[in-house]
């Protein structure tokens, strides 16, 4: 499979949450809010700095634990059925970079006020995920000075050199999906040669 974890894109190489299967390809149980908020006059209302923060339906779909757990169960059932039919399931591991929507960074500020989530490293200097990224300036809140894969700020580079916590978390994720109840048969690593620091 191409990446199937929570992500705003169709290709899903800009992973938002490695812990859960995207409810848009899994199961949406709770579906509240609007795609984008509208004023009484019907105009779209957007925070110009963080327009995705206003997509309340998307935020509900991808942060609500009921949707996320249902999607993981859907995937576990799918893998079990694939194995019954003699098929192997290989996941695409995108561990070089994530997406700007990722809960660890949260450049889109969709987790900033979501219940049950820590502040992302873009939002807060005190984020538990700050070491997961290489920041070039000490400017918070909303620090835009971080390393992006090939310079793309929508694909924040993961900082393995300076974060043992990140390495351990990614190892946990890798083990999680090949263990019960998911039992995936293996991983294909995306841009494996780029893992770690890059010159750009």
Question: What are the functions of these language-model segments?
Answer:
Residues 14, 199-200:
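Residues at alpha-helix caps and immediate loop-helix transition turns in enzyme cores, especially N-
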């Amino acid at each position: 499979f191409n990446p199937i974890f929570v992500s705003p894109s169709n290709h899903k190489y800009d992973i938002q949450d490695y812990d859960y299967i995207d409810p848009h390809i899994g199961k949406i149980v709770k579906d509240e809010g609007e795609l984008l908020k509208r004023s009484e006059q019907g105009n779209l209302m957007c925070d110009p700095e963080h327009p995705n923060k206003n997509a309340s339906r998307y935020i509900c779909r991808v942060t609500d634990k009921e949707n996320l757990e249902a999607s993981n169960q859907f995937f576990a059932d799918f893998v079990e059925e694939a194995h019954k039919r003699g098929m192997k399931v290989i996941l695409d591991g995108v561990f070089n970079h994530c997406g700007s929507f990722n809960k660890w960074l949260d450049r889109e500020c969709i987790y900033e006020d979501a219940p049950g989530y820590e502040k992302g490293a873009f939002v807060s200097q005190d984020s538990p995920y700050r070491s997961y990224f290489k920041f070039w300036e000490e400017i918070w809140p909303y620090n835009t000075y971080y390393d992006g894969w090939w310079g793309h700020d929508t694909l924040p580079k993961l900082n393995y050199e300076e974060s043992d916590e990140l390495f351990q978390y990614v190892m946990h994720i890798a083990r999680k999906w090949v263990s019960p109840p998911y039992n995936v048969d293996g991983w294909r690593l995306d841009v494996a040669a780029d893992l770690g620091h890059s010159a750009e």
